[in-house]
Amino acid sequence: MNQIQPIITATLAAGSTASPFLLTLNVTQQLCETTCADAPIIFTPSVSVDEWAQVDTGLYVVTCHVDGICSYTPCQGGPCCTRTQLVAGAFTVPVYAAKAPTAVTITTGQTINTVSADPCHRCSRLLVSETPVILTVQ
C-alpha cells in the first residue's frame, strides 16, 4: 500500500455559483518509482460522494472520495516492467444552500495525466492528474 498520501484539491470554476457546480479535481501523487516524463501514465480516478453535513446555517460540506490505480513504466524498465500503485484520498466541497440537500451526485469528465519533471530531467516521481467534475446538489 502507498504510504505517501496524495494531495487532492477541488477548484470551483469561475461563474459556477449554483448547482450543478463545475469543478476541476487535481490529484498530485508521489510515485514509488521514477518514470519518464514522456512515457504514458494511466490513472482514471473513481470519484464518489461519501456524505454531506450541515456545518452552519445554510452551509453544508460535501465529502467526496477518490480512488484508482496508477499504471506506469519505471525509468530503466521496459514494457514488461509496468508498475501499479493505489491512489486514494478524500476532498471536501463547501456548499451554500437555503434548505438541506436531499441528494448529492457527482460525475466526472475525461482525465488528463502528466508526469511533472524539471526541464533538465527526463524522469520524475510526481503524477499530476486533472479531471473535470460536476457536483449536483438537490
Task: Walk through the language-model features, giving the residues of each.
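Viral structural modules
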Residues: M1-Q138
